[in-house]
Amino acid sequence: MKGSFTSSETRFIQQATLEYLKVRNNWTTQNADGEVVDRIIILLTDGAKKDNWSKDITTRMNRKTNQEESYQGLEQVLNDMELPCPVETISIPDGKSEEEMWTIFNVVYEALRINDELYFDLTHSFRYLPMLVLVLGNYAKFLKNVTVKHISYGNYEARDANTNEAPLMDILPLTMLQDWTFAAADLIQNGNIKKLQELKENNALVPLLRERGKKNIDRRLAEGYLDAYIDSLRNFLNDMKLCQGPNILSGVTINQIRDCHEQVSEAFEKVIAPIPPIISKIQKSLKDFETTDTMYPESLRNGYEAAKWCYDHQLYQQAVTILDENITTDFCQRLGTDEHVYKERTASNALLRWGVYREEDWEADTLEAVREKVQVAACSPDILNFIRLMQKDAVWIHNGCRNKYNHASMIQGTEGMLTPEDIEKLGRIIMRIVGRIR
């Protein structure tokens, strides 16, 4: 029994499960190339084969009455169902030792094919088999690109005393929650959103939502908000990987993430309570981008935090590029020059690197008012202090690291190739700068 579904009267959960999955209507024997598409695999210990499987079984001893009674083995029951696909049996050991456990693992794994869709029933299994199936499922997802579509358990102990009907429990949502957890961890640790996007595109929340039995409107809202949240995370990651300075400094994608986070958390509290903590964990990994610091405007803070985020996620070229450009933008804003005008930006950068105002850095067609303003500002305590703090690092970041990266260490005069020690130095500089603004 599952929701509105009730199987034929049967002693075998396998029959009930196959009826629930509508195997007779939806599964096939062969594809257009004559290859076997769908299969039913029954795992049999020697004892199970002898006592419950063989079609030659016609009677068995009733342990309660101690009398022999009519009995039909599962093999005959499945034959009578006239299933459209082959039924295969695989012998497995009793699973009484660690060695036998690994034998079962390997036997089941070898039976799987590339890109298989798996439907498991765990009812008559060893106590550790549910854990084995969870591990095996993830193992086969990685190595054979399989998809786990169904995991069920016939809970005979919870049967109705009057009707003798037992519930068929769908435990796939537990594995789906595991998938969402792993995908979120991959995003937080590696900056990789691919797994989250795949779950979104494959409607991987459907089993979870269906199991919770919530209103359709709640489901649609939750799914819609989650889709928007994942899209906003993807936009943020694209900004990092593609060094989209204007988006990073404006905080547009961070604000999108913040808005979507509030919506999706509220929606999922109503339908799947375990999801919001996963989302909150993602949100906490981006908390350093949220700032009201008065000395450093939020845009500049986000630039430095973006450099650190990229470094932490091993996007070193993006880290040094964003850091280099953000230092220049920071200096332009302090100096009063327009960071969006190439000549003013370049000349301001030269002032930072040389530490003094040089007339030759400011071309003749540069606005006189800008040049005069810079000459005055260059002597101010704020500018001199910024130069003192940043000059050495800024020169190394641009010449000693970024140029080597951008030119693949192929250009002469860049003092050799980029080394792991250079990357470590970059990390120390980023931490030092970020530490000053936090």
Where are the predicted features?
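Elongated alpha-helical scaffolds
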Residues: 119-135, 400
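Long, low-complexity, Lys/Arg-enriched
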Residues: 1-117, 138-438
